[in-house]
């Protein structure tokens, strides 16, 4: 039995941008099951512009809690606010105990999620078999189905990948940022909030940039304010003759501007990051770098993505930093390997 008899759903969203984008596959499945259903979402404020590009969603409510904040009293007040919405089901996508309280206090009768931090009672429609759904997106999508019908990932029907709406960037804004879309633009997703073990060396990004520019293209270094030093170092490593064709917009765009810039570009090279999942959902060819992390858990959900992945004995460790302090998993993924994949993707 699927959820087609239900009409109103609430999503408790993941906090990480990449996880949030992957969760769109769940919303697409819910709309497939019942095109007339209403899907509301409770998510961090910074994600709201991206959520506006997901046509499956209706109401968007800000989750005010910072990462790691418990505050049971406020969670009770937040849940109580949702009672009058009379949701049929809530989907708790994060694994934390605290993320399950809002749906419980909202008195939503069907509360779905995986076990996570021993969330018995709070989640009354619980799956305990994460190991049977290796990919994070499979876990999200599985929640749309009855546990007795879809027991493992093999039972899942084929589902749609995330697809964010992209729009042409305003010409005035493009000019302010120094962008030129008349050329083939390569996006560099050189950041990753998780930590150094996801960061491909800046010297390697610089080599890729110089190669692309010598093919007649331009390169865009993009990211949040945290990525400003990284993009600046890439620029410093460029040869003088290629620097005029590199545009540094790190910290200068909001999420939707970044999405629209990606959507108007030719290709991308990204670390395993939220931007990687954004590029995938914008349906742009990309090469993805997996050092400490694994494509067996959170791969880019796109037929236009190719991954280069470490084969070090310690891979994947999923650690923020390298315990050996060598970062061999990243350093042994050479620029030439990435260039070959780009050529394969674009038939250069």
Task: Please report, for each region that a protein language model flagged, where it lies by residue.
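Donor-binding and catalytic core of enzymes assembling or modifying cell-surface/extracellular glycoconjugates
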Residues: 202-291
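Active-site donor-nucleotide binding/catalytic segment of nucleotide-sugar enzymes
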Residues: 168-230, 292-295, 338
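An aromatic- and histidine-rich active-site surface loop
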Residues: 27, 45-50, 91-106, 279
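A short, glycine/small-residue-rich beta-strand->loop->alpha-helix junction that serves as a flexible
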Residues: 11-23, 50, 92, 194-201
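Mid-sequence helix-capping/hinge segment at a functional interface
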Residues: 114-197, 235
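Nucleotide-sugar donor-binding patch of glycosyltransferase catalytic domains
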Residues: 113-118, 130-133, 233-236, 248-249, ...
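An amphipathic, basic-hydrophobic alpha-helix
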Residues: 67-87, 101, 105
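Conserved nucleotide-sugar phosphate-binding/catalytic loop shared by glycosyltransferases and other
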Residues: 38-71, 130, 310, 314
